[in-house]
């Protein structure tokens, strides 16, 4: 994962570049140049959501899977943590508890950063910050790109369980969260994105371009860039879960649930680091 304060449009330590999202946004909603931008503040735990994400008039339809994106120690604790780490951790814990109780599929995405990065494999910052509950319905998928589907077994895992509807949470909003959600949409999944369960960093000021962009504004822009297909809800607490139609039984032996070698999947935790 590349932090936005490391390289606005400059080569990053990982050798990748920040790029504009590819989500489809109606032309009529595109912004024109402005001399000033409205203030966006972080969302307090129990205050009203932004007008654009007003509470739905009817209960949300349940989802069959939860994708927890890069909730790794470096990004949610210590000096490198996103500003709203405490909120994201609280909401993610709630989502995990309800998903597990309902028998939904849970997938923890874990980013393998470049050597020397805060999330380089097998460093303290790389570790998943929240506990994984081993079993056939809970997996860890390691990745090397922002998109959790890129060169991983995530798509096959969802298909095997019959998942067609899922929720996404984690960090960073405009990078790995958005990239993973966008691909899920392109693959035909229904995607629910709880507004209070993802976060990112402030974007630092750039001479002759902009002042500092608050993290809350970056997160909101990331949601908007996903287009009309994504379902943005104000509260993670409003997301219900249900077991997917083809999910393995909870009592299935671990050996039967183990994936084939080379898929990058593990029901009990991260697999060995891939050869470099």
Swiss-Prot record:
SUPFAM superfamilies xref list: Isochorismatase-like hydrolases (SSF52499)
CDD domains: nicotinamidase_related
EC number: 3.5.2.19
Pfam family, one: Isochorismatase
CC cofactor note: Does not require a metal cofactor.
Reaction it catalyzes: streptothricin F + H2O = streptothricin F acid
Listed Gene3D superfamilies: Isochorismatase-like
Active site: 176 (nucleophile)
Keyword Hydrolase: yes
Entries under PANTHER family matching the protein: ISOCHORISMATASE HYDROLASE, PEROXYUREIDOACRYLATE/UREIDOACRYLATE AMIDOHYDROLASE-RELATED
Protein name as catalogued: Streptothricin hydrolase
Gene source species: Streptomyces noursei (Streptomyces albulus)
């Amino acid at each position: 994962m590349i932090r936005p304060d490391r390289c606005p449009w400059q080569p990053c330590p990982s050798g990748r570049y920040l790029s504009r999202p590819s989500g489809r946004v109606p032309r009529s909603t595109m912004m024109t140049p402005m001399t000033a931008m409205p203030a966006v503040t972080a969302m307090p735990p129990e205050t009203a959501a932004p007008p654009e994400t007003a509470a739905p008039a009817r209960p949300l339809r349940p989802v069959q899977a939860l994708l927890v994106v890069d909730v790794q120690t470096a990004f949610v604790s210590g000096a490198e943590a996103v500003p709203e780490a405490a909120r994201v951790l609280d909401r993610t814990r709630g989502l995990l508890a309800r998903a597990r109780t309902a028998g939904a599929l849970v997938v923890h995405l874990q980013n393998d950063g470049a050597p020397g990065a805060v999330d380089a494999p097998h460093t303290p910052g790389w570790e998943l910050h929240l506990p994984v509950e081993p079993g056939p319905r809970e997996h860890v998928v390691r990745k090397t790109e922002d998109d959790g589907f890129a060169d991983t077994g995530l798509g096959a895992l969802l298909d095997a369980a019959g998942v067609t509807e899922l929720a996404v949470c984690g960090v960073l909003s405009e990078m790995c969260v958005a990239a993973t959600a966008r691909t899920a949409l392109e693959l035909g999944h229904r995607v629910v994105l709880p507004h209070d369960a993802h976060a990112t960093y402030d974007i630092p000021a750039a001479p002759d371009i902009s002042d500092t962009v608050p993290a809350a504004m970056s997160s909101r822009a990331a949601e908007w860039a996903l287009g009309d297909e994504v379902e943005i809800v104000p509260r993670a607490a409003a997301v219900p879960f249900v077991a997917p139609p083809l999910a393995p039984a909870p009592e299935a032996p671990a050996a039967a649930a183990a994936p084939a070698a080379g898929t990058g999947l593990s029901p009990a935790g991260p697999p060995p680091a891939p050869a470099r």
